[in-house]
């Protein structure tokens, strides 16, 4: 399996980021998160964050988090700041982004180079 990803960290939370905006979340995401998150044996991370197409009108994207144990999380402040930076550097260069999460719509604002506030 060939997989394009970005690994980012925010305040010691490190995740593997997948662009799922057009392809959708992989069907085996729970097993994939467990496999790729294993430190010393694979990429190693706190889990996988999928950057998906938004579900709320006016949102820029949706963030879905899959922890290293394969469970789905609702929200991660450090993770969403990295999603904002990823979106900003991959064509959505807006200083304020609206990102869907399982905890609702979150607004993330650019405070400076690589600095974001939720």
What are these regions (language model features)?
Residues 1-112:
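A glycine-rich beta-to-alpha transition motif near the start of alpha/beta enzyme domains, typified by
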């Amino acid at each position: 399996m060939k997989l394009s990803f970005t690994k980012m960290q925010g305040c010691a939370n490190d995740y593997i980021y997948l662009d799922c905006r057009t392809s959708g979340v992989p069907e085996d995401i729970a097993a994939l998160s467990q496999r790729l998150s294993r430190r010393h044996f694979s990429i190693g991370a706190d889990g996988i964050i999928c950057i998906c197409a938004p579900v709320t009108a006016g949102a820029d994207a949706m963030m879905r988090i899959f922890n290293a144990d394969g469970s789905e999380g609702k929200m991660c402040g450090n993770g969403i700041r990295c999603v904002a930076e990823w979106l900003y550097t991959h064509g959505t260069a807006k200083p304020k982004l609206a990102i869907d999460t399982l905890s609702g719509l979150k607004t993330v604002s650019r405070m400076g180079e690589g600095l974001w506030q939720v």
